[in-house]
Amino acid sequence: MIRKYNLYQIDSFTKEKFTGNPAGVITNADGLTDYEMQKIARELNNSETAFIFSSKDERYDAWVRFFTPTSEVPICGHATIAAHYARAIENNLETSRVYHKTGAGILPVDVIKENDDYKIIMTQGKIEFGSVIDGEKKEKLLRALNIEKSDLLENYKIQIVSTGHSKVMIGIKSLKTLNKLQPNYDVLSKLSKIIKCNGYYVFAVTSEDSDILIHGRMFAPAIGINEDPVTGNANGPLGAYLVHHKLACYDNSIFKFKAKQGEAIGRQGIIEVEVRVDKEEPVEVKISGNAVVVFKSELVLN
């Protein structure tokens, strides 16, 4: 039997094609097997591809699964933006809140219609603070990134943080150093197995752009992504990290900032992050961004 699927290529965290972070999206994924989804993700070769399935439960509107070229992951920020952008276009949605089932739980997504286009706001998963990377593991990490201890920001612990898909937070002093990073991907992959975390988010806090607080780069070679252009599940946890370690300035229990990523690889995009704070601790993280359709096609399978 011939099966036809709606296939999109969408750039997230940008309004300009060929920038931001590209994601594949299949909006009518019912009937696809795990094997087929993995093959499709490998063929498209984006850092993630999102597959939208019909809801089978009144608690959520859609079930979304995310695959890198090599494996399934619980959730993905830019592919969530892409998936719900495509879904909003197909269904001509008005401003609304929808819920999607993911590997990180059932989470809300806000679809904001403005000027005949959409902005997507993703509420991320449970905030979790993991291990601090120190000692021999820290030495291995610095060697893998080809940076020195003197490059690190003081009082910024190297720590695993998650809002659904964990990342190692690594603060460095210089934007110039950030843009020149040339990691040893093989060593990073091996270290991931030891620390049980696949992504490394190296960031600089800068005042060079008055509108941008964070510039970053994210490496995840252990799951087939040497460098991810713009990463929702790195900047979201970073917001929680900055609040938790009292490195953030905010008013009225809301910490907001913008992060720019992808500059070093020619795919820059901007993420807006909002952290709700209660009793000086982060309790909820949202990320938001724009998107643009690069192409729409039809995938035909027998």
From Swiss-Prot:
Q: Enumerate the UniProt keywords alphabetically.
A: Isomerase
Q: Which residues cross the membrane?
A: none
The broad enzyme category this protein falls into is isomerase
Q: What is a GO molecular function of this protein?
A: isomerase activity
Q: Which Pfam families match?
A: PhzC-PhzF
Q: Which domain of life is it from?
A: Bacteria
What family does the entry list? Belongs to the PhzF family.
Query: What protein name applies here?
Result: Uncharacterized isomerase CA_C3446
Q: What is the lineage of its organism?
A: Bacteria, Bacillati, Bacillota, Clostridia, Eubacteriales
